[in-house]
Amino acid sequence: MAKDIEAAAAAEGGEYMAKDYSDPPPAPLIDAEELTKWSLYRAVIAEFVATLLFLYITVATVIGYKHQSDPGANAADAACSGVGILGIAWAFGGMIFILVYCTAGVSGGHINPAVTFGLFLARKVSLVRAVLYIVAQSLGAICGVGLVKGFQSAFYVRYGGGANELSDGYSKGTGLAAEIIGTFVLVYTVFSATDPKRNARDSHVPVLAPLPIGFAVFMVHLATIPITGTGINPARSLGAAVIYNQHKAWHDHWIFWVGPLIGAAIAAAYHQYVLRASAAKLGSSSSFRG
């Protein structure tokens, strides 16, 4: 069993908890001073570059798979159909693992507006940082997909540009539910992997936080690629839609923003008010008093 040294004792006016870890104080809603710090802009640049690389590798994988599995364009390879859905899922999950590992110490390794939104609701990041991250992630995604189109212009439009769309036979409600549940799994994993209590126990193995996050992305892709192509990342969906810019990319685009944001909000509430309720009560509750 995991080591958990928590001794509850009675004290005047309530209880206190002695523990082997400390919860960071809640981030301020608006921190104007943060705008004067280079560390913020360094983190924003890291989010931009990470999201650019994420979209470039993953969308290029999708386009390559569709080209290899197209019997009309590549009959020799059509029988083996390239990497397949499993390979696409590995590309998305593997890149998240790599990029979270590389950027966690600089920006926190969000690489996803839904993750940023969930952490903002949990008061892990300020509003200023959240807005700048989401802008950087969106621009990075657009640039990343733009590189794919530039390098593979012959195949990009022919194979759908890697854009998310609702598959035939599925209702909008089903697509929305798939995005909500998929994003919940991802953001729930992010909260669990970065929990201060877990970090205190596993800090000697720094790879442990990025690994489950990458696996969560991998597993969600296996489940939802047949339904929506798997969004769970509004920046990923926006970047592909902007560069592809066809009707089908925009027709149900709202699903890939509304679903992930709802899923992230539910995950934040579940983690903060159910799983970590005792820590919230015994922690910095005074910060919410006027």
Curated annotation (Swiss-Prot):
- What does the entry say induces or represses the expression of this protein? Circadian-regulation. Expression is higher during the light phase than during the dark phase. Down-regulated by chilling.
Location of the motif NPA 2: 233-235
- Membrane topology of this protein: Multi-pass membrane protein
Chain location of the short sequence motif NPA 1 per the record: 112-114
Read off the InterPro entries from this record: Aquaporin-like (IPR023271), Aquaporin_transptr (IPR034294), MIP (IPR000425), MIP_CS (IPR022357)
Write out the annotated subcellular location.
Cell membrane
- Identify the PROSITE patterns for this entry: MIP (PS00221)
At the top level of its lineage, which domain of life is listed? Answer: Eukaryota
| MF terms (GO), sorted A to Z | water channel activity
Q: Which UniProt keywords apply?
A: Cell membrane, Membrane, Repeat, Transmembrane, Transmembrane helix, Transport
A single Gene Ontology CC term = plasma membrane
Expression sites (tissue/organ): Expressed in roots.
Q: Which residues cross the membrane?
A: 43-63, 82-102, 131-151, 173-193, 207-227, 255-275
SUPFAM superfamilies, per the entry: Aquaporin-like (SSF81338)
Pfam families in the cross-refs: MIP
Q: Which Gene3D superfamilies does UniProt cross-reference here?
A: Glycerol uptake facilitator protein
The family annotation for this protein states: Belongs to the MIP/aquaporin (TC 1.A.8) family. PIP (TC 1.A.8.11) subfamily.
Q: What does this protein do?
A: Aquaporins facilitate the transport of water and small neutral solutes across cell membranes.
- Domain commentary: Aquaporins contain two tandem repeats each containing three membrane-spanning domains and a pore-forming loop with the signature motif Asn-Pro-Ala (NPA).
Q: What NCBIfam families does its record include?
A: MIP
Q: State the name under which the record lists this protein.
A: Probable aquaporin PIP2-3
Which gene is transcribed and translated to give this protein?
PIP2-3
